[in-house]
Amino acid sequence: MLERFFYYLLPTTYYLFIKHMALPRIKIAKDKAELVQRLLDEKRTTGMFSTYADVIAFAASLGVKHQRRSPVTEVSQSEPAPISLEVFISRGYERLIRLIAVVSTEDIKVLSSEAESAEAAILIFEEYANGGLEKLQQELRGAVDYTDRLVLILNAERFSQ
């Protein structure tokens, strides 16, 4: 599946990635690292997501929904460190990354086989994820149990439409 994704999305850089195994990494802002950790359901804590990739994908979707796009200025180097694109691909988020890029730019060229287009799509995804994490920080401030608060947020979103 990984090889098919790279061939489909990045045919000209496909062999470069496979040859050097230098897959791009999705960066997380240093000031959001603690929030991302707390959203992870590790040993039945306050989180409800299985992986960091799930947290970031949800945050990116939330960022798009609320039109919040914020650049990652300082990258977290500790837990969670930047996440390999391979993790997102294995979880099925490659389409989400491409969809967000196309919707954001309103230009199908972002799906081209050029390496710059792939980097642009990843950058857009990171920025929306950071914006979504900012929104989550505001919404979850003071919450003891993130699961209950996230359910309330999702229900409010559902009924507000």
Residue ranges of predicted features:
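Short, basic amphipathic alpha-helical segments that act as recognition/interaction helices
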Residues: 48-74
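Charged, low-complexity intrinsically disordered terminal regions and linker tails
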Residues: 2-42, 57, 69-161
